[in-house]
Amino acid sequence: MAPQMGYDRAITVFSPDGRLFQVEYAREAVKRGTTAVGIKAADGVVLLVDKRITSRLVEAESIEKIFQIDDHIGAATSGLVADARALVDRARVEAQVNRVSYDELIGVEVISKKICDHKQTYTQYGGVRPYGTALLIAGVDDKRPRLFETDPSGALLEYKATAIGAGRNAVVEVFEADYKEDMNIEAAILLGMDALYKAAEGKFDAGTLEVGVVSLQDKKFRKLEPEEVGNYVQQILEKHKETENKE
């Protein structure tokens, strides 16, 4: 039996070198998930997901990876779909409880911390397992866009631009080179799609992409219609076609 086997099976026991293996395995589930992207712009915040449909028999509309949490908050998920759905439902309840209790919209950071607190409890009690999903939570409060990432351990980080899922490294590489804090929502969408294009090695189209935005102007979350997504995708495809022709 391998030396780490006992620590491998127990969620509540640290290994001698300070690791919780089940939490690490939950992170691996996220790394194998679809690529989700979040970008803060000067006038809002953007979420994009490549739904990575594996069969032409699947109805693309039945796969949802971007969700509305409240009027001004959206979330993108990667990892185990059922786990993500449970966390999204919990976040929606928290948002409604805050609205009823205090007669005001919940803060983006507040809802992110509540979800992280819940995820953290599933790393320290027996008889449960960590959530095998990560969330990008995006919204607008205090007259500025916010973007947070929650991981299976319950850790919380705020980003200007980031990604989760299988294509994370490729996407972050693009962001580090091309992200600008003063870009608008349209430019952020194009940057996100360009990063997803490179992460997917050009294997994407409007039918596999989901895009959500929260504008600083109206503080409303909305998902782009397929026609809008298609227009952005066409711009990206034309851009890369021109680049290939020049080469």
From Swiss-Prot:
Domain of life per record: Archaea
GO CC annotations on file: cytoplasm; proteasome core complex, alpha-subunit complex
CDD domains, per the entry: proteasome_alpha_archeal (cd03756)
InterPro entries in the record: Ntn_hydrolases_N, Proteasome_alpha, Proteasome_alpha-type, Proteasome_asu_arc, Proteasome_asu_N, Proteasome_sua/b
Keyword flag DNA-binding: no
Gene Ontology molecular-function annotations: threonine-type endopeptidase activity
UniProt keyword terms in alphabetical order: Cytoplasm, Proteasome
Regulation: The formation of the proteasomal ATPase PAN-20S proteasome complex, via the docking of the C-termini of PAN into the intersubunit pockets in the alpha-rings, triggers opening of the gate for substrate entry. Interconversion between the open-gate and close-gate conformations leads to a dynamic regulation of the 20S proteasome proteolysis activity.
PANTHER family for the chain: PROTEASOME SUBUNIT ALPHA/BETA
Complex and partners: The 20S proteasome core is composed of 14 alpha and 14 beta subunits that assemble into four stacked heptameric rings, resulting in a barrel-shaped structure. The two inner rings, each composed of seven catalytic beta subunits, are sandwiched by two outer rings, each composed of seven alpha subunits. The catalytic chamber with the active sites is on the inside of the barrel. Has a gated structure, the ends of the cylinder being occluded by the N-termini of the alpha-subunits. Is capped at one or both ends by the proteasome regulatory ATPase, PAN.
Role: Component of the proteasome core, a large protease complex with broad specificity involved in protein degradation.
Family to which this protein belongs: Belongs to the peptidase T1A family.
Name the record gives this protein: Proteasome subunit alpha
Organism the protein comes from: Methanosarcina thermophila
